[in-house]
A protein has these predicted regions:
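Well-ordered mid-protein domain cores that form the structural environment of catalytic cofactors
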Residues: 72-127
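Conserved, structured C-terminal
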Residues: 1-12, 18-20, 28, 104-107, ...
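Conserved hydrophobic/aromatic beta-strand scaffold that supports enzyme active sites
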Residues: 46, 54, 86, 99, ...
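Acidic active-site catalytic centers that drive phospho-/nucleotidyl reactions
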Residues: 48, 97, 203
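Acidic, proline/glycine-enriched N-terminal capping motif
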Residues: 1-88, 93
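Short amphipathic beta-strand starts and helix->beta connectors
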Residues: 35-42, 87-97, 133-135, 183-191
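N-terminal glycine-rich flavin-associated loop
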Residues: 47-61, 101-109, 148-151
């Protein structure tokens, strides 16, 4: 609703319509992307990342399950930590990727690509039922349960501090690739320090029914820093400059991690 009111242009991504860019006055795509990306690099930008696939993973064998479906190791990931994972097909070609967070001893939250969420869940369920039925693991799709606002840029930490005044956002207390619980107006939320732009970034997850309120609160907190909403086109630019891949855009089903110069994420010990 907020995106429509602010005249966002939309594009189809998977089963969703995502804000493509936010033109001001008579801006075209190129002009809007240059403005949005400069704001994200110089001060602060905000992206609606709600459409990323989210799979709740629970069970005593959850760590072992992740160890089997991703190319890298997962058994030693600490509670409250996040890790990027790459998923391959049986033929060794890149299938999907995303960041998974360890919420508890036997509890993880996996994110997938927007377009791949349903297929990834289906594949994981298939593995559990046919390949590894002995594993104690339960999967639940929670993509539409949570709204996600991603705030990035040099001033993102200052904006988060305004939203969560009682929380310590220092690098020691809240390092990169970690997660903490928080509250906004007594509503529980999850805060992840994750970056898809190369800039300092935080993602806030909250129940979907509070998504618009969260977005408006972030915009209000970021006003003094001229926080700028940006769409998928700017996201593609920022992540490409950093060297991050998007499965389905940089891959076509025939790409291996080595083709993508990502052999660093393939464990040699399992």
């Amino acid at each position: 609703e907020w995106h429509i009111q602010n005249k966002a242009k939309f594009e189809n991504v998977g089963q969703w319509k995502r804000p493509w860019y936010y033109p001001i006055n008579n801006e075209g795509l190129h002009e809007a992307v240059q403005r949005e990306s400069k704001a994200a690099r110089d001060s602060a930008g905000i992206l609606d990342a709600s459409t990323l696939g989210k799979i709740d993973i629970q069970g005593t064998d959850a760590s072992e399950f992740l160890n089997r479906v991703y190319t890298n190791a997962w058994s030693k990931l600490g509670i409250g930590k996040c890790r990027y994972g790459l998923m391959l097909n049986e033929d060794g070609m890149v299938y999907d990727d995303g960041v998974t967070t360890r919420l508890g001893e036997n509890h993880y939250l996996m994110t997938t690509t927007t377009g791949g969420a349903a297929n990834v869940l289906s594949k994981l369920e298939d593995y559990l039922q046919t390949e590894w039925p002995e594993l104690d693991v339960y999967l639940t799709s929670v993509t539409d349960h949570y709204s996600t606002a991603s705030i990035c840029g040099p001033n993102s930490k200052k904006i988060l501090k305004k939203i969560f005044p009682d929380k310590d956002f220092s690098d020691d207390a809240f390092p990169h690739m970690s997660y903490q619980n928080g509250k906004i107006d007594e509503i529980n939320c999850r805060i992840m320090r994750i970056s898809f732009t190369g800039e300092l970034s935080y993602e806030i997850n909250i129940e979907s029914k509070y998504g618009k309120s969260l977005w408006e609160k972030c915009i209000e907190a970021g006003k003094e820093f001229k926080i700028t909403p940006y769409g998928t086109e700017t996201m593609h630019l920022l992540r490409a400059e950093k060297g991050f891949i998007i499965v389905g855009q940089d891959t076509d089903g025939t790409m291996t991690p080595i083709d993508l110069q990502m052999d660093w994420i393939v464990s040699k010990k399992k």
